[in-house]
Amino acid sequence: MHHEAPLYTWFGLTFNLANVLMITVTSVIVFVIAVLATRNLAMKPTGMQNFLEWVMDFVKGIIKSNMDWKTGGRFHMLGMTLIMYIFVANMLGLPFSVVIDNKLWWKSPTADPVVTLTLATMVVALSHYYGIKLNGFKEYAKGFVSPMPILFPLKIIEEFANTLTLGLRLYGNIFAGEILLALLAGSLATGVGGTIAAIIPTIAWQGFSIFVGAIQAFIFTMLTMVYMAHKVSHDH
């Protein structure tokens, strides 16, 4: 069933209130996790601190697989933020959705292309910023005309393609998962027969969606570091 988005117009700008709500919820959850994991730091980590250090090591491995740590270390916190934020965002729409007056209020924020394309645009923009900051504008500009100046139009197209594929890949996977979960939930509500037939596929798809959400958070973070490495390396 199609549900409308709760929209609000302010000074000529239209805001999706569901996106605002879910982005805020995701940010608060990630912030709380970070605070709980670091409020009582110990030399021998346990519990939440142990989990956060594992995430840090995991992201460090992603960065080191793409660039020298001396250069890539500055992107450690960016990678940490992205992988945790996107994973939490991907999970929010799995347990349930909230619909009030046919308006969808509770969902995964990454099930909206506006959110994922905004994240992708931010990542690509940051890669250009650090490309100029670390290599200088002249060296940065060379990347668009090497090995041959005739490739310049293709390089520009590549930048737009990177933004679209990075954002739409995340959106497509999460949105498709929520659509299927909604269909299965509808089957659960059709009666005893529908409930029995749909309960096992629903549980199975919930588990698979957790896996997909984790993989998509990893892929987004990995591609972020690939784009960063491409711009900050001296031989790009």
Swiss-Prot record:
The keyword Ion transport applies. Its main location: membrane. One of its GO terms (biological process) is proton motive force-driven plasma membrane ATP synthesis. GO terms for molecular function: proton-transporting ATP synthase activity, rotational mechanism. One of its GO terms (cellular component) is plasma membrane. Disulfide bonds: none annotated. It is a multi-pass membrane protein. SUPFAM superfamilies: F1F0 ATP synthase subunit A. The chain crosses the membrane at residues 17-37, 80-100, 114-134, 179-199, 208-228. Keywords: ATP synthesis, Cell membrane, CF(0), Hydrogen ion transport, Ion transport, Membrane, Transmembrane, Transmembrane helix, Transport. It is found in: Cell membrane. HAMAP family: ATP_synth_a_bact. Key component of the proton channel; it plays a direct role in the translocation of protons across the membrane. PANTHER family: ATP SYNTHASE SUBUNIT A, CHLOROPLASTIC. Belongs to the ATPase A chain family. F-type ATPases have 2 components, CF(1) - the catalytic core - and CF(0) - the membrane proton channel. CF(1) has five subunits: alpha(3), beta(3), gamma(1), delta(1), epsilon(1). CF(0) has three main subunits: a(1), b(2) and c(9-12). The alpha and beta chains form an alternating ring which encloses part of the gamma chain. CF(1) is attached to CF(0) by a central stalk formed by the gamma and epsilon chains, while a peripheral stalk is formed by the delta and b chains. This is ATP synthase subunit a. It comes from Anoxybacillus flavithermus (strain DSM 21510 / WK1).
